[in-house]
Amino acid sequence: MNSSSSTMNEEPDALSVVNQLRDLAADPLNRRAIVQDQGCLPGLILFMDHPNPPVVHSALLALRYLAECRANREKMKGELGMMLSLQNVIQKTTTPGETKLLASEIYDILQSSNLADGDSFNEMNSRRRKAQFFLGTTNKRAKTVVLHIDGLDDTSRRNLCEEALLKIKGVISFTFQMAVQRCVVRIRSDLKAEALASAIASTKVMKAQQVVKSESGEEMLVPFQDAPVEVEENTELPDYLPEDESPTKEQDKAVSRVGSHPEGGASWLSTAANFLSRSFYW
């Protein structure tokens, strides 16, 4: 009884912490601070060995975002347990195929951080092809869609949006940037962005526009058609679908120029680090 009550009183729990870190890491403005923090990176490494698969997958998503910042890669590679934990995820027979691929991509990025750009690109592609073996031949190329969502202004609206997106067959993953009312969604290439807009419109309180870049590099908001699009729904909520490399990385960079609020992210890191230090000493 005591152990169960102490678990209930533990606030926040592992999944909420790792999801918050993942969402913070999605913003390029926060990536250096997260890696420099003494508690967050070691905590993410420990999360890779967590018994709950969604915690492991979310930790890997956070690490992949952090590794997109070149300045972070050497420190991440040298962090105690990083490369070994990634290898363990890749080699563990019970790891889902999409999680193996994600861990393999991070491992390749970090392992290749001291190679020339050409060598790094070739080696990463080679390893990615090997990782693809775990998924068979059905994996489809993924793309990134950046949405500006009118009405995405509090936690309850965010939860509604999450529920709507999770129902769509073909959604791989998504992260929110609440300060700028945006959601970065990874989807299969055969899924139309209009399906995302229809799902969000079904909440009745939010409306999505797509963020695109003009030829001059300026951001534009493109409205979707008002006519609803038929959406193929998941009959049961699966793990995240496997994804391949995204051909629309520029859209992530477009979002990075819009300031979120790094001060808020930095202050939250203290809370996360305190939780991590309390939770992982046994």
UniProtKB/Swiss-Prot annotation:
Repeat (ARM) residue spans along the chain: 39-81
User: What InterPro entries does the annotation carry?
Assistant: ARM-like, ARM-type_fold, Armadillo, ARMC1, HMA_dom_sf
Q: Enumerate the Pfam families for this protein.
A: Arm
Q: Which UniProt keywords apply?
A: Acetylation, Cytoplasm, Membrane, Mitochondrion, Mitochondrion outer membrane, Phosphoprotein
Q: Where is the PTM N-acetylmethionine found along the chain?
A: 1
At which residues is Phosphoserine found? 189, 246, 260, 267
Spans of biased composition, class Basic and acidic residues? Answer: 246-255
Q: Which GO terms describe its biological process?
A: intracellular distribution of mitochondria
Question: Single GO molecular-function term?
Answer: metal ion binding
Phosphothreonine PTM positions read: 137
Taxonomic superkingdom: Eukaryota
Where is this protein primarily located? cytoplasm
Localization, UniProt: Cytoplasm; Mitochondrion; Mitochondrion outer membrane
Q: Where is this region: Disordered?
A: 239-261
Instruction: Write out the GO cellular component annotations.
Output: cytosol; mitochondrial outer membrane; mitochondrion
- What do we know about how this protein assembles, alone or with others? Interacts with mitochondrial contact site and cristae organizing system (MICOS) complex components IMMT/MIC60 and MICOS10/MIC10. Interacts with mitochondrial outer membrane sorting assembly machinery (SAM) complex components SAMM50 and MTX1.
Annotated function: In association with mitochondrial contact site and cristae organizing system (MICOS) complex components and mitochondrial outer membrane sorting assembly machinery (SAM) complex components may regulate mitochondrial dynamics playing a role in determining mitochondrial length, distribution and motility.
Q: What is this protein called?
A: Armadillo repeat-containing protein 1
What organism is listed for this UniProt entry?
Mus musculus (Mouse)
